[in-house]
């Protein structure tokens, strides 16, 4: 079954038959020692911190997939109002949350 996902509050041309509630995927990541060292050096001289960008992208993708799995467990075929949120966990960890409302279309 294909999961339709939107950041909007509806799917154009579709009728939402049932709202199933909030679904989410949460991932907490911290950089490896080498990523931390490279990030520290980059922060001194400036520039893009590629290792951190890659870590964040992987965390977002994993959180997104976990949200989809949560929706599938509810037999949803759509997710509306999908959002990402991030926060720091301690000094070295970053939390990525992906959430939305599971629906049946």
Curated annotation (Swiss-Prot):
Coiled-coil positions: none
Record's signal peptide: none
Superkingdom classification of source: Bacteria
Similarity comment: Belongs to the UPF0145 family.
PANTHER family named in the record: UPF0145 PROTEIN SCO3412, UPF0145 PROTEIN YBJQ
Descriptive protein name: UPF0145 protein LPC_0273
Organism field: Legionella pneumophila (strain Corby)
């Amino acid at each position: 079954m294909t999961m339709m996902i939107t950041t909007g509050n509806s799917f154009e041309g579709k009728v939402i038959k049932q709202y199933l509630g909030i679904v989410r995927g949460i991932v907490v990541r911290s950089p490896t020692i080498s990523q931390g060292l490279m990030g520290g050096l980059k922060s001194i001289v400036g520039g893009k911190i590629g290792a951190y960008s890659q870590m964040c992208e992987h965390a977002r993708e994993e959180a997104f997939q976990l949200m989809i799995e949560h929706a599938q467990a509810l037999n949803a075929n759509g997710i509306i109002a999908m959002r990402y949120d991030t926060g720091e966990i301690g000094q070295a960890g970053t939390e990525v949350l992906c959430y939305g409302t599971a629906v049946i279309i």
